[in-house]
Amino acid sequence: MTMLRPAILLFILLTLVTGGLYPLLTTALGQWWFTDQANGSLIIQNGENRGSRLIGQNFTDARYFQGRPSATAGSPYNPMASGGSNLAGSNPELDNAIGERVAALRAANPQASRDVPVELVTASASGLDYSLTSESVAWQIPRVAAARQLTTEQVRKVVEEHTQKPLVNFIGMPVANIVELNLALDAQRKN
């Protein structure tokens, strides 16, 4: 009986600390210091939620830059089913999927002269990538420019404005947030 009382008190104390105090404290600090991130990094335009800066979207229209393929179950870019395909590099199913993606990208981007960037035909581990490297974005510029009836230079300028360079040159590559880039192109059309 002498051991039971301290055990119950410790259980109650740890439940209050780890189940109540700690979550409340981290939520409060997150809301205070990182308000945008704690609320999903949402992109709000004209009072309307257009998406998140951190989750890709399934852009299929020729006017939009397309992100990496999504391997999420059910529907592309489903945030409730985040995860990769888990197909081995030697799996014929993966080989066929990549072949189909290359053929579809070549058909949709006949102006592209270089090989299709690997990033555009392979899904990421999360299946929800929101950004692409400059190489993959540049490969799509002729298609997007033609579909929007803009010059490649006009589109390239918007791409450069939305390209994030790495903090240190030898760590990482320049990337563009595809959701923000496509929204910027839409906004340019309205102006």
From Swiss-Prot:
Keywords: ATP-binding, Cell inner membrane, Cell membrane, Ion transport, Membrane, Nucleotide-binding, Potassium, Potassium transport, Transmembrane, Transmembrane helix, Transport
Main location: membrane
Subcellular location: Cell inner membrane
Highest taxon listed in the record's lineage: Bacteria
Gene name of this polypeptide: kdpC
Organism placement in taxonomy: Bacteria, Pseudomonadati, Pseudomonadota, Gammaproteobacteria, Enterobacterales
Transmembrane segments: 6-26
InterPro entries for the chain: KdpC
Record keyword Transport present: yes
Name this protein carries in UniProt: Potassium-transporting ATPase KdpC subunit
PANTHER family membership: POTASSIUM-TRANSPORTING ATPASE C CHAIN (PTHR30042), POTASSIUM-TRANSPORTING ATPASE KDPC SUBUNIT (PTHR30042:SF2)
Example GO molecular function: ATP binding
